[in-house]
Curated annotation (Swiss-Prot):
GO terms for biological process: antibiotic biosynthetic process. It comes from Streptomyces violaceoruber. Pfam families: Polyketide_cyc2. Pathway: Antibiotic biosynthesis; granaticin biosynthesis. Keywords: Antibiotic biosynthesis. This is Granaticin polyketide synthase bifunctional cyclase/dehydratase. CDD domains: OtcD1_ARO-CYC_like.
Amino acid sequence: MVQPAATPVSLPSPTVHRSEHTVTVAAPPEALYALVADVTRWPAVFEPTVHVRHLAREGRTERFEIWAEVNGEIAHWRSRRVLDPVRRYVSFRQEHSRPPVTSMSGGWLFRPLADGRTEIVLRHRFTVADDDPAAVARIEEALDRNSARELGALAALAETGHPVDELVFSFTDTLPLQGAARDAYTFVERAERWAELLPHVAQCGADRAGTGLEQWLEMDTVTADGSTHTTRSARICRAPEWIAYNEQRTPRLVSGHSGEWTFAQTPEGPVATARHTVAVDPSGITEVLGPDATLADARAYLRDALGRNSLATLRHAAEAAQRA
């Protein structure tokens, strides 16, 4: 006797949770849209973001990997975004979410208001495994905290009254290596030894987290005038090719600083490169550089100070590679 086919069991659809965060900013929507649309600047502008690496770009669509601080840990996921400069809208969707999140999407909207102001609306939609209430609460808490930090940083930068391109700048220094690039990478990765080996580092502690490929780095740096300042950084290490970092605690003249150390084999031989992206804090210019200093002076000062220290690190890394 033929048994009747079993009736398929339909599983309930996961609950879609929504959040919305807004802020009103004294800046035009075009400038704010441009800041959000350029994801390469995010690590220096948006404090939770540690590093971004593009996977693909085609027209108004882009895919990238992103590392960000979430609930005190460094999370990693892949996202797809669609940019709409006419509507001033940026939509996003995570391609691979981090458990317990099973999906995450949303968008940035920039609404022009009177007197040149803009309302920024940041929306999220997400689902979690098994609709776990505790997981939902954790995700909502993380979204509340990180959205407030992102919107606050965006407002602070845009409301300085200076063009973004005068506040946020990047530069790169490259050094040829006589030894293997892998050995130079190892020197930079093992930052806990820097205080013994680098003259501009007074103290440095490194705590590894998660898989051991992420680090929290706290460092006291000696400046040219002999004073010291303390920075705290999140680092992503991918041996033997690159180390990316984002400063969570910055010196007075800097509102954001991210960077990347890369180690590569070129047709001319192995090289090591240090790249910096810096957001200047205009409110610190007079205190640090004097009453007559300008934004251009601040950029030049930071280019010299940061470049000098990272080149010193690269030279010691090159020497270590040559000895290995």
